[in-house]
């Protein structure tokens, strides 16, 4: 029996996933969480074999949950089910140890089969997304990504410098590097492009 925990912030999707998986004779849904923090508590309580999670949720994101599971060396496999068909998200998910990455518009039977594959130690990745992920690498380094994310959220260079304990000039350099690497005219365009690609 594969013991599964669901993490999904949309109640209707959460209910549909639970109902779908409960139809399978070899899968048991232990519970479902509406956000990342609740999912982390449920992980510690239920100790599932597999976590099926959305990527964007309040509290902790699905990626942050996967990273936390990896950091704590928990024997839990992770499958992300999302609407985000962005190669950058897939690359970050794989870096976080995720075993499966499926799009919500995939056929329903794909989820149960992916669960079995990932539970056995395999990978279940949307094939088209995998091709795109390998063809276009994220040009930003961690610090450029961090500074660009904060700038895109509306923070000034001075605010970012204070928050990250950097000089104002260093923040401006990181922003200039990110803008140059992405081939955009300004930080807003750079932020939008990086979000669109899934690099932020």
Regions found by a protein language model. Name each.
Residues 8-10:
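Conserved acidic carboxylate
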Residues 32-50:
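Acidic, metal-coordinating helix/loop segments flanking the phosphotransfer/catalytic sites
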Residues 35-38, 58-64:
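Acidic catalytic/metal-coordinating carboxylates
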Residues 41, 63-75:
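Short amphipathic alpha-helix used as the core "switch/output" element in two-component signaling
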Residues 51, 78, 101-102:
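Two-component signal transduction core modules
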Residues 54, 82:
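Active-site residues of response regulator receiver
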Residues 88-145:
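Short, flexible helix-to-coil linker/hinge segments that flank and couple to helix-turn-helix
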Residues 156-189:
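Recognition helix of helix-turn-helix DNA-binding domains
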